[in-house]
Design a protein with these regions (language model features):
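Membrane-embedded and interfacial regions of multi-pass energy-transducing membrane proteins
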Residues: 1-204
Length: 204
């Protein structure tokens, strides 16, 4: 991930400013940043789990009985594991999605025979999705008994992520509007991706 980010920042061709990068490259770079920041958290969670299983620690074990006897070491919480897991688990959704959206941006613009509508807004939405993906993980955990105020914060941040997502969807539609469209297989897949993206956003 670091290799990709450094390559994009330092090894662009002459005259290629950051504001002229293809949207595919923006999407790949943000995806790399998500991977660099989120996977170490999961690795830490797994290391703590291995310590619980093999070394007698209690990071994830609360007051628990095994074989009729109380554990000597308690005080942890299985909810901690969920927090650590979903801190990767939600950015991972965008690790999967953003590269596909980046490629679709180029495919749609090429086959509509128009420049992508709202390039800077599209870059901003990619960056916004990347940032917001790190502060919405709690929406996977509403039934765990978390603090209701904290739950409402996660509801709010989850609603916020609809804004950059909608910007991308409407910009794709506007790019298609009155374009000289070629319905190539790549174009059909890309339009299908936008449709699925909108449907998935509405239904969760």
């Amino acid at each position: 991930g670091l290799n990709y980010v450094v390559t994009v920042i330092n090894l662009r061709t002459k005259g290629m400013s950051m504001t002229r990068l293809p949207l595919t490259i923006w999407a790949f770079m943000v995806t790399a940043i998500l991977g660099v920041l989120s996977f170490p958290v999961l690795v830490s969670a797994v290391v703590l789990l291995l310590m619980d299983r093999t070394m007698g620690t209690a990071f994830y074990l609360s007051d628990i009985f095994i074989g009729g006897e109380a554990l000597d070491v308690t005080g942890g919480s299985p909810i901690l594991y969920q927090h650590l897991f979903w801190f990767l688990g939600h950015p991972e959704v965008y690790i999967v999605l953003l590269p596909a959206l980046g490629i679709s941006s180029e495919v749609i613009a090429t086959n509509a025979r128009k420049p992508i509508f709202g390039y800077k807004a599209m870059v901003g939405s990619i960056l916004g999705i990347g940032f917001l993906s790190f502060i919405v993980w709690g929406h996977h955990m509403f039934v765990t008994g978390m603090n209701p105020f904290l739950g409402s914060v996660f509801v709010f941040t989850t609603l916020l992520i609809a804004i950059p997502s909608a910007v991308k969807a409407f910009n794709y539609i506007t790019t298609l509007w009155q374009g000289n469209i070629r319905f190539t297989p790549a174009m059909l897949f890309s339009v299908g991706l936008v449709s699925t993206f909108v449907t998935g956003g509405l239904t969760g």
